[in-house]
């Protein structure tokens, strides 16, 4: 699917056309390719258009609302497995991270793999993430970072969270924040591309 008609629908302030086009694309492509090959590049393109002054903030917000609705519907329509498979994944972002779409894309792909997902939405303090991981008996904590963050702050937050989590709880991190991929962080698994989630889930199942 080409991005131009979708970007035009955003610029024309036509949420119905955008929703219709996205819903059709999802049915035609299947959920995983829809997320990795359409939603992810479209989200990047919208962000770039906003930076370049071609989209207003309200247009970016409208896009986020529409795509959130489409992805939530897709996740809700997945048939639950008779016996839930691991891992159980707790999804969130840390404070100051307002971008929720990355999280939702990850949730859609993990749900498709049969994982049990618990999403706390955005901006959860480190201590609360650790508490929630215990309360929900999470096998994995998955965090999303956009490129708004200072690398030093990201590394410090991740070290703090890793120290508070049980050693048996995996910590997966991803998003467009380049600091996640520049050097290895002990006990933390970076997922640079959404396509890396499926092998990671398979690896987790193989070792548990």
Show the residue positions of the predicted features.
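Long amphipathic alpha-helical segments
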Residues: 1-79
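C-terminal regulatory/effector modules of DNA-binding transcriptional regulators
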Residues: 54-56, 62-208
